[in-house]
Amino acid sequence: MGKSPKEVLAEFQANMSKLQSAIPEVTADFTKRLMPDALKDGVLSTKVKELVALGIAVCATCDYCIAIHVNKCFEAGATKEEIAEALGVAILMGGGPALTYSTFAMQAIEDFAPEA
């Protein structure tokens, strides 16, 4: 069995910190400007934008991205049911690979869901 979503997220955060130290001039634009600006509330809420980002992450077959955006979906107020529906759209658009990566997203939902 592979790494859990929490392990994947922790690994990403540790390695991103190293990358930011090594090439801050490259990473700063993405992490400090582009990402916050793209995901802030606008006509679409941050929650909707995170659900879209999750669907793209699933279609891109990116474990790191899936772990990050499932966690961010919950932080933005999404429910398990809303996240599952977003996965359904990802499967529609991404086919078999998206279906496969949606199983990792389902584990991430269990790992990152707020305590009831």
Regions found by a protein language model. Name each.
Residues A84-A108:
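C-terminal structural segments of small proteins and small subunits
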Residues G77-G88, A113-A116:
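Charge-rich, acidic-biased intrinsically disordered regions
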Residues V52, I56-I68, M93:
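Short, thiol/selenol-centered motifs that function as redox-active sites or metal-ligating centers
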Residues M35-P36, A53, V70-F74, L87-G88:
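Amphipathic alpha-helical segments within well-ordered protein domains
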Residues D41-L51, C65-E82:
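Amphipathic alpha-helical hairpins
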Residues Q20, G42, I56-D63, G77:
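Residues at alpha-helix boundaries and short interhelical turns
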Residues M1-V48, T100-A116:
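Acidic, glycine/proline-rich low-complexity segments that act as flexible tails and inter-domain linkers
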Residues D37-D41, G55, A90-M93:
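Alpha-helix C-capping/helix-to-loop hinge sites
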